């Protein structure tokens, strides 16, 4: 029996069956498949033939395929019986079933290192007693922001009498904690709106913001030190009004806070300060006044506390920021006679946003530190050290 061959409906050559809805040859079918979504679908005729039916340039050929009835929805995919890409089968490991990494698989989870207990009960009591008595001297200023600025000036870094850390251990770390917690309490006691709160709420706010305040204070003091001392080194940083040079600390003892080697603990702690250099450089460039710097301290602390606690505390901290923002506006308009201060304020807030970013982005690092028990510190008031980098 003689085989009947129908001509291709596109080019007229011998067909090879039905492709994408019409009788066509393999060449036209392959052309349609690779060209339907190509540039030829958007172009016009490439020749000047008057008879478009006899023209066979690529745009005209593709147009003819569509007009006669070729349908792109009839394309078929993944018909290969054997995949062209071999995916080797990976058998689950023992650690997958156990649910523990291999380097922890053979360790006894019931055996824990001896914790170092840090009792800050007396420190909290001392701050409570101070808040009961209020500031040591009467405060006279025209608004709330300038009252806070007076408190800030009393705690500025004395660059003329610089002391240097030659060793850092448990005593020095505890001293830093005590210094900043008491300093923040003395500073914020100059704020009338804060003194109107119940003492329990005052303590809760202080426990949340002291380490945020200390972070910007370290960067601001370091910037001030570099500005006043041309010989200052990039590795030098101000902590508790004492200069620490990471390259010249003769003795760094971390055995009391971790069972890991000192170099590993140091590297882990440095992850909490990845943006410090950029923050210091920004402060040097902006050179904020005491009033501007005070506003930056307050805005950063109250913004952090509001986002952390939400609810009633968020309303309180928003009110605090509104009061201080009005005072800052008065400072720009009246004291500095600067009506257009939007860009200046934007640049200041960029620094604060960078500090908040450093806190948020290092939370996964702190979580990993807790999982692998990098720190063996235990505090009497653990809520006081959330996001602080100490736990």
UniProtKB/Swiss-Prot annotation:
A single Gene Ontology biological process assigned to it is: innate immune response
Known DNA-binding region: 5-77
Q: Which InterPro entries match?
A: C.elegans_Orphan_NR, HNF4-like_DBD, NHR-like_dom_sf, Nucl_hrmn_rcpt_lig-bd, Znf_hrmn_rcpt, Znf_NHR/GATA
Keyword tags = DNA-binding, Metal-binding, Nucleus, Receptor, Transcription, Transcription regulation, Zinc, Zinc-finger
Q: Read off the Gene3D superfamilies from this record.
A: Erythroid Transcription Factor GATA-1, subunit A (3.30.50.10), Retinoid X Receptor (1.10.565.10)
Annotated NR C4-type zinc fingers sit at: 8-28, 41-65
List each copy of the NR LBD domain by range: 130-388
Subcellular localization is given as:
Nucleus
Give the molecular function GO annotations. DNA-binding transcription factor activity; RNA polymerase II cis-regulatory region sequence-specific DNA binding; zinc ion binding
Biological role stated in the UniProt entry = Orphan nuclear receptor.
The protein in question is named Nuclear hormone receptor family member nhr-115
């Amino acid at each position: 029996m003689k085989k009947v061959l129908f001509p291709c409906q596109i080019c007229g050559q011998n067909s090879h069956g039905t492709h994408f809805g019409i009788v066509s040859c393999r060449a036209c079918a392959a052309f349609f498949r690779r060209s339907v979504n190509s540039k030829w679908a958007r172009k016009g005729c490439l020749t000047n033939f008057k008879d478009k039916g006899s023209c066979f340039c690529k745009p005209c050929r593709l147009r003819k395929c569509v007009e006669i009835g070729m349908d792109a929805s009839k394309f078929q995919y993944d018909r290969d019986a054997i995949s062209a890409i071999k995916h080797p089968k990976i058998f689950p490991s023992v650690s997958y079933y156990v649910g523990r990494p291999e380097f922890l698989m053979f360790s006894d989870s019931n055996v824990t290192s001896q914790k170092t207990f840090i009792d800050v009960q007396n420190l909290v009591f001392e701050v409570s007693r101070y808040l009961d008595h209020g500031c040591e001297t009467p405060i006279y200023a025209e608004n709330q922001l300038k009252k806070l600025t007076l408190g800030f000036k009393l705690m500025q870094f004395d660059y003329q009498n610089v002391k240097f850390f030659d060793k850092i251990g448990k005593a020095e770390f505890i001293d830093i904690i005590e210094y900043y917690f008491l300093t923040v309490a003395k500073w914020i006691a100059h704020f009338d709106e804060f003194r109107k709160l119940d003492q329990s709420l005052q303590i809760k706010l202080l426990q949340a913001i002291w380490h945020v305040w200390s972070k910007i204070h370290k960067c601001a003091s370091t910037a001030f030190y570099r500005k006043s001392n041309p010989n200052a080194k990039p590795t030098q940083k101000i902590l508790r009004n004492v200069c620490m040079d990471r390259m010249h600390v003769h003795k760094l003892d971390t055995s009391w806070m971790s069972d890991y080697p000192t170099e590993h603990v140091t590297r882990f702690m440095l992850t909490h300060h990845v943006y410090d250099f950029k923050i210091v450089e920004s402060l040097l460039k902006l050179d904020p006044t005491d009033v501007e710097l005070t506003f930056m301290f307050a805005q950063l602390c109250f913004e952090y506390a509001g986002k952390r606690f939400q609810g009633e505390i968020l309303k309180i901290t928003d009110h605090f920021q509104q009061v201080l923002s009005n005072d800052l506006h008065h400072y720009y308009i009246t004291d500095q006679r600067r009506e257009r201060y939007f860009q200046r304020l934007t640049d200041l807030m960029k620094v604060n946003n960078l500090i908040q970013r450093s806190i948020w982005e290092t939370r996964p690092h702190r979580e990993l530190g807790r999982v692998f028990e990098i720190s063996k510190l235990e505090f009497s008031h653990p809520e006081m050290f959330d996001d602080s980098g100490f736990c």
